[in-house]
Amino acid sequence: MQQISSPFSAAANPASWKGRLRDGRLIHIRPIDAADVSLERDFLSRLTPEGLSYRFLGLIKDNSEEAARDLTHFDPREFALAAIADEDGSEVEVGVACYRTSDDGTRCDCAVTVDPAWQKCGVGGILMQHLIGMARLRGIRRMYAVDAARSVGTHALARHLGFHSRPDPEDPASVTFELELND
């Protein structure tokens, strides 16, 4: 692997990857950037209210242009990957995985969400594998996520990826997932 002096340098941003889903479809994984506002807005419009709530723990409640813009313009501590599919010759965002590092750069909070029509095909797993790889490459030592305790799909994906879970002591409706990245 390439040594990178700054974990957020341009050299740390990959061009893209391809991923084959369980059903044989191909997706393109790439970093999200400011030019993706319309893809992100369309993606948000396909999420159910429950999906928005799971993904953003209730912080984003709509698919407005402002919400899409906020999700495509990052500060240097944030990184996000999109899963892009070709549907009838058009690019369609079908999933997103992102993280935000702590102030000291040793930990990051992560999240993943997948278009309901593309769930249970492997999109979330592929996105998270690449997100975990990028976090390791950038020297992050621990990744964590907080999600609704009722989110069964998230629990299964987290276990598959090697995360350990524990109930959130301050909120019984939430669970915290943690993954050590320095092994």
Where are these regions (language model features)?
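Long, contiguous binding/interaction regions
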Residues: 1-183
